[in-house]
Amino acid sequence: MRRRHKDKHNTDSVSDMSSNDSASILSSASQNSTHSRRSASLQSLHSQSHQYPQGHNNSSHRQASTYSISSLSPYDKGASLSRKSTNISISRPIKTNDSNVFPIKQSFQLERPNSAFEIERMFRELLEKLNFKSLPPQATREMLNYDIDRKWMMIEQDARAEYDRQQRYARAQNIFSPEEYAKVLMSKQVSTNQLSGLWLALRSEPIDWVRRFVYDCQGDTLLSVYLTKLQQEMVSCNITDIEDDIFDKEVNVLQSLKCLMNQRLGAERIKTDVDVFVNAVSGSLLSPRIITRKLATDTLTFMISYNGNNDNGRYHKVLRALDSINEKSRMEFDSPDNYSPRKLTRKPPQPANFKRFELWLNVVEKTIDARGKFRNSDVGASDELKSAYAGTRGSVITTRNQLENHLVEYCIATMLLINVIVGNGTDYRVRIHLRAQFRAAGLDRIIHKFLELGNEELDNMITRHKIDANNDEEELKYSANFNNEDNEVDFNDPVNLVQSLWQSVKNSDAEGYFLSAIQHLFLNQSEKRGNPEEMNRSLRVLDGLIQNISSVRTVSEDTAINVAINKLISNMSTDDMYRKALEDVKIYRRIAEEATAERDDMSRQLSMGADGYINSLLNDVKERDMVISRFRRINEDMKEELEQMKTKYMQEKQESELEMRELLIMLNNSEIGANAVKKDGGKTTISISTSNEELAARLKKQIHRRRAEYKLDNRQLGTNVEPSSRLRALRDQMGDIENMARELEMTDFETYADPEEEENNNDQSPEKSEIDESRSSQESEAEIQSVEEDEEEEEKEVVIPPLPVPSGPKRAVRNDDLVRLDHLRKKLANLQSESNDIMKYNSSSMFNKQKFLAMERLQELENNFKDFNIDFAVSDPEDKYNFNSNAGSVDDSIKNKTKEVLAEAEQIREELRRQLAAAQKIKSPSPKRNTVLERIENKYVKGQVKIDAPDVVSNSPRTQKRAHRSTTLNAMDPKFLQELSLKVGKAEPIQDANNKNQFGGPLSSSPEDVSQKHKTSGDSSDKDKVLSSPISSNDIKSPETGNSTTSSAAPPPPPPPPPPPPPPLPPILGGNNSSAAPPPPPPPPPPPAFLNGSGSVIPPAPPLPPPSSGRSSRSVPSTVTKSSGSAFDKIPRPKKKLKQLHWEKIDHSQVGNSFWNDPNTHTLVDDLMSKGIFDEIELIFAAKEAKKLATKKKEDLDKVTFLARDISQQFSINLHAFNSFSDEEFVLKVLRCDKDVLTNPAVLDFFGKEDIVEITNTLARNFEPYSTDYKTEEITKPEKDPNELQRPDRIYLELMYNLQHYWKSRTRALNVVVNYDKDYVEYVKKLRLIDEAVDSIKNSKHLKGVFEIILAVGNYMNDSAKQAHGFKLSSLQRLSFMKDEKNSMTFLHYVEKVIRTQYPEFLEFINELSCCNEITKFSIENINNDCKEYARAIKNVQSSIDIGNLSDVSKFHPSDRVLKAVLPALPRAKRKAELLLDQANYTMKEFDDLMKYFGEDPTDQFVKNSFISKFTDFMKDFKRVQAENIKREEELRVYEQRKKLLEKPKSSNNGDSNASDQDGESNEGDGGVMDSLLQRLKAAAPTKGESASARKKALMRKQILESQRKRTTGSVGSPTNVSPTRNNESDSGVDNKDDTHGSSPLDEQFHDSITTQEDRIRDDNRPPEGVADFSNVEDPENPDVGARAKNLLQELRGADESSSKLSDAQRYRQERLKKKSVQIDLDEVAKNNNSE
């Protein structure tokens, strides 16, 4: 503003400076002259120039002559410099002192005229200058009536103000010498003030000064060069403000050039250096300011016309300069409508397809179209026209008044230049050609708009242009012999032109060429008839070619054609460059938008200041530090988890290796089968076959590979996980077995002979020895075979699922075979089959001896395997000797004995089966035998880790083994058989197949057994599992089986019992143990008559009082008026609506005999009217008139609307804050993204609503004629005027419809940018609250103690089946459901009591979890989703700007600045989104971990959202029961205190009154005072059927207190004189509750007894005094027992009520009475003791 105020100048600056009347006043006062104000202003200005001696010769020279301008405005015609006599002395009107110092201080002095008439005239001129006609007439009259002195004072003050203004202006003009001006112009660093001073100096300085500037300093050339430099600077700089200094400099330079040319010495310069002038001035024809264009137009007109008759060079130079403006960039207001803002944009050079003069005339036409709707008004005018005089110091009123005139002057100057250009053509052909070019450029349209201005001078110029055109056409007709009437040619009719040409070339040699040219033209255009764009392009090329040929002045036609073709090619190449430039413009415009956004962001940061920006950065750093710390914590946790996973991975590998080794052992045990023992040639051959050799070999390879992988993984993962002890031992043992097997393979068996055996053989006979040997061998073999048969028979009955072998014979699978024994058996069999040394021994005893030695070795190995829990029992049913095949080595007697033993074993097996079937008992396979196999099978086959089969204890007898038999030397050692019998697993008895389930157990048992087992279910969980195990459908194979299964299945569990009813209040709080509390009694009735001492009935309440007299008196006139029509007519009506007085009117029929009969209304109304009362009432009691809804104006009613009514109403409601703006202004505010639009959330939300942005087909069809397509390169005007639409429709059209291709993305982006910071703060706050809650729960020191107490007490209460290691949080809500035996206390009450009394430190958990209360109002899942949606929205906006709807700026509305608002904030928003996502992920991870820590499922959304609320609900319930417990304990404490207080004086009284022999009885009575009293009160209580009113109870209590007070008035020293008072106060102030809540059972019984006494008294009609003697009724022997009991009950009942209802004063009074009663009781005791 300061620069604008300082640097703005225009053509009228001097005249405006002296436009006030003070100059004329000064002139008239001093010279009595009638000079104009303008000349006086110049005189005063010239007198000031003496103060600057640098550019002056002497003062007399300046006084003798000066320069003046006849028309100060440069727009006025005939503006020229001339010498005039000033006719004024410098020293007379204004006293000045010469000084060489600048600035100069001068004194102001104005001489007063002697004539009063002169002062009067000067004063009237002053009033005219002040526009006194706008003042009120009264003020004007007062000013005219001022005295002469006051008028002169006002004149002098105005003159002094004008003088000071001139002085300030003179000081602002830094006048330099010509050389100094030349120096600053050459340096191109001249300021606006200096250029303005140069322009003033060229007008006011003497001719010598101007000559020095022009000839000596080449000032005109410097000005032209500087003007060119300014034009280049405008293009290079991104100037958007029309009021920039650079435009002021351009105006000042053109004004200076015009001043130079206005003098002859300057005008002569254009003859020599016209090129510099023309090129500089022609560029100003495209200036955004009208004043600049007008000056440039006048200058060019002068250059062509000045002595141009003999110099056509300047004329052609001007034409070439006009042709070159198409190649120059320009600045203009970039908006397709008339309500664009004051924002400039740089336009690139126009393409070569623009016609000659087209760009220049387009600028003129645009200026005319931008004028206002009304004459001399800027309403509807564009900023281009409004800013025509930007930089001037004229007043706004002056500029507005001259706006239309200066636009007309610009049009006149333009039309004059056109006429000069056309008129200076060499001949009529050139002139006709120039006119054709002007018409092609749009001159006809401009002339039509010029005529609409209605200016006479402009109309004359247009008429002159048309006359010259007609003259040239006539000359053309004359020269071409077209002047005959038959050959009249119309140059605007193409058909007439072609006919004329055809007539001229017909029957000549040119006929063929003409016809061929027309035919080719027709054929060329006929092919492109369907494509108007191509047709236009081809015709343009053809016209350009013909035009270039016709414009070339040369004799050679070939040269003309070549020149035309070259120009055409140049133009076409320029078109390609232009298209490429357009693509570049899109890119650079985007870059410019981003740069502008960055600049604005930097400006915003700078505006924040150092402190603000540092604080912002510190906040960002804190947030990042917090996120980094959390990531570090997560990283540490992940490292720990990774280490754990590595360890777990290695342990799983070890487990897998262990399982494979165990599986290999089982396979090896199960594969040994003695398939055949053949006797061949006295040799024994044992063949052992396996069915899983390949699987075993593969397992061995896998074991070795796993061991190698294990070592490799340890090295790669950097872990050192040692194998388990079992795996290590198994590895070592298997290695030992392999080594020993290799040793056995390499052993050379030799003949072995025992010395003792040899001796026995020598002593005995050969027959006996042979018999003994055979017998011993038979017995040993039979024993071995019997043991093996028994084992095989037992193992056959064990149901073991087979291994899934894809092929091969079906075989049983065993998992507890004797690993080492079977393995070595296999090795021995292989050795025996392969060794020739063994096969040569035919002696059975020798074979058995070798076998015995091997088995002894196996025994040693088995002892080493005892610590590894390996069962060496043989379970293969096929692993037995085939005695038929071994017949060659066994005697017949042994075979027979073996068969007998086998038959006996078969009988025993059948007997055992029958017994087992009768007992219906089962025994499942041994867990040790099944554990390894089932674990492997469940893991790799069934997909399970562990399946535990129930263990059922069977009482069936087991098969007894044989005793060890004595053997000979050749038999096996009995120790081996003993050990073998102990180690081989004994099979269970065989069960009936129909009675087995899938686990090998019975399907069911008898109902008795089931019931018996149900009884013992709490002691054995395994039995429950067996009874409730599901039965597979695959096991039911027959109807019988199915029936038995159905009938004998375990019954389903009984349904759960219904939930218990809500617990009643405990007795101490007024609850009842037997039933619910009775409803509260009705309110008490009024006291009966006999208690009031009168038999009269209480009178009813009096009626409402009548209205006040004051109100009635005020309502007199209106009432009478309404009752009488004539009186109503006489009362004047108010001018505006008043507040209504609401009263109860008296009917007209009741007025006759009433107070209101014949009131004196007429006189009173007249009196009130005369006194102004009614007027005052209108001011005081004016009613607020309801605002009328804004009705549509007449022009709005005539407008069109297409929107639905509800949509239009939404526009009106949401945009009501912008009703003061017009439609165009509001649309521009939205497009410019003004702050008041962006800060209004209702507007942004409304713009983004789906029903607003979704355009239906009907709306699209209706709005299409009014729409503007901004997606095309050239924006065309709509078919219909959008002003015909109503306001909502117009806004909808301009925003939602015209911008529908990117409106949704635009609105979404603005919403994100505006709200991202606020949303971020909100989400971070919620996340941090969640973090605090999670940390408080996780780090709580006392919460775990509370839960452990609950768990311990609960486990103590539950039976063994419901024992728990922990409980879920949902169980906390059930703690208050379980109540005690009397329903007076819940489990939570007891837990709180235990914690408060035994573990008070645990109560701190409430404070530790206090921060959880804030989280309960939030949904955890919604917060997480909101954070993700926040980041997703910002990402979508970035995508829209990169590759989406917001990526192409060329498709935006020209005034849209959405990127300028979005781009600066987007990087920060992206950073915020990343930080928010990181914090949300961390928070959710911690929250999920906490849920897992408490055994909850984090994937369940309902559980997740209610997780924190479970803690808060528990705390609320805990606080509630804590308050209830404390309240109950306080009541009990008060009760105990009162009880002790009552018992103490009673014991002393009883000791005084009773004899010594009754001491025992009195002591007993002292201990049972309360009990006896309660018994008596119960006996006096009414029956259940009797109902007593609470009102009666209260009344009786009151009467009892009154009677006691009367009775105890005389005996103050009695112990009972205090209790009634205390009771009275308790009744009156405290005990007003009729319900039983909070009262004890003793209180209720006392109430019942009182009610019974009241009924008795009412029936007997006794006086109140009888009722008061409560002691006589209750206990005649002890008169104070009833009063004491009553007082006790009152105090108990009022203990908790008084705290809430009594005031401080009443509470203090009650405490004082209590102390008094205690003191009185103590005094009584002391008296009694003294009397004794």
Swiss-Prot record:
Homodimer, and possibly also homotetramer. Interacts with actin via the FH2 domain. Interacts with IQG1. Residues 1-81, 331-350, 754-814, 948-974, 992-1136, 1541-1569, 1601-1714 are annotated as: Disordered. Residues 765-778, 1010-1026, 1653-1663, 1693-1711 have a biased composition (Basic and acidic residues). Residues 52-73, 992-1009, 1029-1049, 1547-1557, 1609-1629 have a biased composition (Polar residues). Keywords: Actin-binding, Cell cycle, Cell division, Coiled coil, Cytoplasm, Cytoskeleton, Virulence. PROSITE patterns: DAD, FH2, GBD_FH3. Residues 12-51, 1109-1118 have a biased composition (Low complexity). Disruption phenotype: Leads to swollen cells, increased random budding pattern, and severe defect in cytokinesis with enlarged bud necks. The DAD domain regulates activation via by an autoinhibitory interaction with the GBD/FH3 domain. This autoinhibition is released upon competitive binding of an activated GTPase. The release of DAD allows the FH2 domain to then nucleate and elongate nonbranched actin filaments. Residues 1128-1544 form the FH2 domain. Residues 578-672, 724-747, 773-924, 1419-1442, 1518-1544 form a coiled coil. PANTHER family: PROTEIN BNI1 (PTHR47102:SF2). One of its GO terms (cellular component) is spitzenkorper. Signal peptide: none annotated. The gene is BNI1. It comes from Candida albicans (strain SC5314 / ATCC MYA-2876). It is found in: Cytoplasm, Cytoskeleton; Bud neck; Bud tip; Cell septum. Belongs to the formin homology family. BNI1 subfamily. Residues 111-557 form the GBD/FH3 domain. GO terms for molecular function: actin filament binding; cytoskeletal protein binding; small GTPase binding. Required for the assembly of F-actin structures, such as actin cables and stress fibers. Nucleates actin filaments. Binds to the barbed end of the actin filament and acts as a leaky capper, slowing both polymerization and depolymerization. Protects the growing actin fiber from tight capping proteins and so increases the time of elongation and the total amount of F-actin. May organize microtubules by mediating spindle positioning and movement in the budding process. Required for the maintenance of polarized hyphal growth. Residues 1050-1067, 1077-1089, 1099-1108 have a biased composition (Pro residues). This is Formin BNI1. Residues 1563-1595 form the DAD domain.
